[in-house]
């Protein structure tokens, strides 16, 4: 088996933000390679931790690493959009904290067979859950030009979405686009030479867009956070680590909405209880990685941690 190095980002900060109680019930919504899971377990005595991951490889790797799973830990091979259903199946209707570490893990990026990276020539795949049928190859070869433009613009914030989509549309009429390197060359061809020389790898934005579309990432996140806000107890917290602006804006917007005072007439001496928010932002601004972490973990550079706490039912 190939060994992949993975450094968990904001490991101590995200776990500390949960304020873990030894007898509490917690959820790690993104198991990955188990960094945050282990950190939470270190604080539990009689408590319980449910760790989710839609990637079978993550479940298998962590299971093998533990050998025998701690009695406090339950692993769930499901997307975190199934949060409520999965917890209900386990007899859990409320929890004391939930942690999300979003995006693609380093092992997923570094496994060339998964097709997540423009650095390796591999079949176009990008599925986090290998059980699903939609993959990157299907999107690139079958989705209409207009849909390609839409996802490149919306999910990749790519300025040359139309030009790239046109190149793809033209190429796939000649032969199917089946590998990451084929796609990289088409992306490069759709971006003017001057623009290719700035802003990092020219394929980065389109690969991100296709990955988000394949895995329906933003919709899954929004659905999961809505459930999480209902599941946590008073005093419970949700910690979310994001790595790109689309995720961060979604989390920021949702947290701001539920932690803000509802519309009330101006001039009221006291804001009525019905208008008071049920949640509070633990930090007004996101927590960022330390200089020390940035020096040893390049993946941490875009990370932001946002935390919210439930203060009323």
Curated annotation (Swiss-Prot):
InterPro entries, sorted: RsmH, SAM-dep_MeTrfase_MraW_recog, SAM-dependent_MTases_sf
GO cellular component: cytoplasm
Keywords: Cytoplasm, Methyltransferase, rRNA processing, S-adenosyl-L-methionine, Transferase
EC id: 2.1.1.199
GO BP terms: rRNA base methylation
Single GO MF annotation: rRNA (cytosine-N4-)-methyltransferase activity
Superkingdom in the source lineage: Bacteria
Tagged with keyword Isomerase: no
Primary subcellular site in the record, as a coarse category: cytoplasm
Record-listed S-adenosyl-L-methionine binding positions: 34-36, 53, 80, 101, 108
Protein name per the record: Ribosomal RNA small subunit methyltransferase H
Gene responsible for this protein: rsmH
